Amino acid sequence: MHALMRARPFAALISAGSAGLYASHLPTVLKDDGPYGVIECHLARANPHWSDLAEGNEALMIFQGPEGYITPNWYPSKALHGKVVPTWNFAVVHAYGRPEVMRENDWLLRHVTELTAQQERNGAKPWAPTDAPDTYIEVMLRGIVGFRFAITRLKGKWKMSQNREVQDRVGVVKGLSARAAGDDLEMAEIVSRRITQSN
């Protein structure tokens, strides 16, 4: 589950508090602290969601992995008996916890430095906060509120055609590889890997 969370670090944060139901989408950094890990993230100070999170209620973060439509036309079993229907393949992780508000400048600077390094790691010349004037970074930090989200439970769901016969899964791999749109190639790799593991 951590592998998906690291590969797809842009998560949906959902909470319900005295102001009602909120949802925000934000980049994350996953740490290996504690039994399930800790997620560090931030919101714009102008986003009212952060004050709701400060109440300390349980919240949910959703990490969406590869997903896509699967046509039954890819199943060889369609020609044999016709008992096939379309479906949707997907991978998702739900992380639950109680966010802790982090407002200290040192914490925020460390967080945005780590987040930037995580996202810039494959660049020829990675950008870092130290590339900008200190006074500018200080102003930018005043515009965000950080959160430390200690995960209390994790739930993952992977539906990658594992319920189909091997020949149908091979058909899915071929179909996804030929369509090659969105997450298709990543899904084809996952389905193919699971065929190999099950043999």
Where are these regions (language model features)?
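Binding-site signature for planar aromatic cofactors or substrates
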Residues: 1-199
